[in-house]
Design a protein with these regions (language model features):
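Ordered alpha/beta subdomains of enzyme catalytic regions
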Residues: 1-213, 244, 319-464
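Glycine-rich phosphate/ribose-binding loops and adjacent secondary-structure elements
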Residues: 192-367
Length: 464
């Protein structure tokens, strides 16, 4: 498409594209915005190297001729990103059909970065949202991210570790992610460690010698309760040298039953401080079930179903042209029609006002940022008979903030702990009804009345 724009001499036409998704993942009441730092790094460093140009030069069309003109390749060689970018910050709670990112500039540049931006936003937002749901279901327990082995490739595992930490995990077993992103690291030994020694007890003793300050013992290699007895023996040996066993891990079987039996036996032996760690294909629903069964698990090791977004492996964010600047220098709004109402985009360069009342979010209103007149009424895009008005009792904030200005980065990315805290703050302001794992109450997101009327008028005109 970039080549086509260049070929038809409209490549410098000013445009605005918006990123949004049509449905909250996991049937959740919200999503967690994540991936912006990767997008910033990509946009801040995008260029065409000699190697890139040589590869593009080698491509042939079906008739055997060069796919691209030499002049176009020269043009790409001098490429310099020059767009404006506005985005919602990482760690904010977001909702379907809201503009998450606006990219504004020459249409060939906006089009060029589409796939990379969607890729980075989609996956990271999925994982952060999944981690958040697991964190909420654990009711504040420690969650360890154990997903490296099951993640979709090395790059996927690194992104997943970062997004999981933002979403609510406490530590990661991915040491490289710990190094790159300053995430606390933690891990346990595997069954192979136990099998490498003549007995389970010997393996536990040797592990405690190597890791006296970070010792978590996996007790289900042969028999969980026998393994617990061996762990208790090692815990008592550690106490003799003023050390403490951190925990015992159960990776199979009836986790609720076994955790209760283990807790009782540990407490009987004066080891109330030893934590019980559970793993084995956990997700937010199994955590909730185990909580309801009053299991004695206080640390959750989660891998596969977190880092693969197991039950919703694609977010489905889209990137739509919403405005073009005309020869008079004014913006013409653009809209894509569809037989499916959900696929009709909001036209224009849009911003979001998030309203707050009594320390709770009250609703998000999408409005046209080029329109000086903004009403106090928003309309449900799926049912025009439903609306909400925001009076002076509500305060508000604009969600999309400037990231790039004419290609220059003007935003400083916060550290991960700050992003994580931002999410915690947002979740406190989100009513509990929107945070239910199943059948959450819909958070109010609507279109400002003037924008709604204009959108409706555009649809009717195009369908004449």
């Amino acid at each position: 498409m970039c080549y086509g724009y260049w070929k038809k001499n409209i490549h410098l036409k000013e445009s605005n594209f918006s990123v949004f998704f049509r449905k909250n993942p996991f049937n959740s009441g919200y999503a967690v915005c994540c991936g912006l730092e990767f997008i910033i790094d990509y946009l801040n460093n995008i260029k065409f190297t000699d190697s890139d140009i040589n590869y593009l030069k080698s491509l042939k069309s079906d008739d055997g001729n060069n796919l691209f003109d030499k002049e176009f390749l020269k043009f790409l060689k001098s490429f310099k990103f020059s767009c404006d970018v506005e985005a919602i910050e990482e760690g904010r709670v977001i909702f379907s059909n809201e503009p998450i990112i606006n990219i504004r500039g020459p249409i060939y540049q906006c089009q060029l970065v589409e796939s990379a931006i969607i890729n980075m936003f989609n996956f990271n937002t999925l994982i952060a949202t999944k981690a958040s749901r697991m964190s909420l279901s654990s009711k504040g327990d420690t969650i360890l991210e154990f997903g490296l082995r099951r993640a979709q490739g090395i790059d996927g595992s690194l992104s997943a570790s970062r997004a999981s930490y933002i979403g609510g995990t406490s530590k990661t077993s991915n040491v490289l992610a710990g190094k790159l992103f300053d995430i606390p690291v933690s891990g346990t030994h595997s069954h192979s460690w136990v099998l490498a020694f003549d007995s389970e007890l010997e393996s536990f003793k040797k592990y405690a010698e190597v890791m006296p300050n970070n010792c978590i013992l996996l007790i289900d290699t042969f028999n969980t309760m026998d393994g617990l007895d061996n762990a208790i023996f090692v815990a008592k040996e550690l106490e003799k040298i003023n050390k403490k066993l951190l925990g015992v891990r159960i990776d199979s079987g009836d986790l609720a039953y076994l955790s209760k039996k283990a807790r009782a036996k540990l407490d009987k032996n004066g080891l109330e401080y030893v934590k019980i760690v559970a793993s084995n294909d956990l997700d937010e629903f199994l955590i909730k079930s185990l909580k309801n069964q009053k299991s004695k698990i206080s640390v959750w090791g989660i891998g596969t179903k977190l880092v693969t977004a197991y039950d919703n492996p694609s977010l489905g964010a889209v990137y739509k042209l919403t405005a073009l600047k005309n020869s008079d220098g004014n913006w013409d709004k653009k809209i894509k029609l569809s037989e499916q109402k959900i696929k009709i985009n909001n036209p224009g360069i849009n911003q979001i006002l998030r309203f707050k009342k009594k320390e709770l979010f009250g609703g998000d209103m999408i409005y046209d940022s080029t329109n000086e007149k903004i009403g106090d009424k928003m309309i449900d895009p799926n049912d025009s008979t439903r609306f909400k008005k925001f009076n002076k009792k509500y305060s508000y904030e604009k969600l999309l903030i400037k990231i790039f200005e004419k290609g220059k980065l003007i935003y400083k990315c916060p550290d991960l702990k700050s992003i994580k805290q931002r999410l915690e703050d947002d979740l406190l302001m989100l009513d509990n009804s929107h945070k239910r794992l199943e059948n959450p109450h819909s958070y109010p997101v609507g279109i400002e009345e003037n924008l709604y009327k204009e959108k409706k008028k555009m649809i009717l005109n195009l369908r004449k």
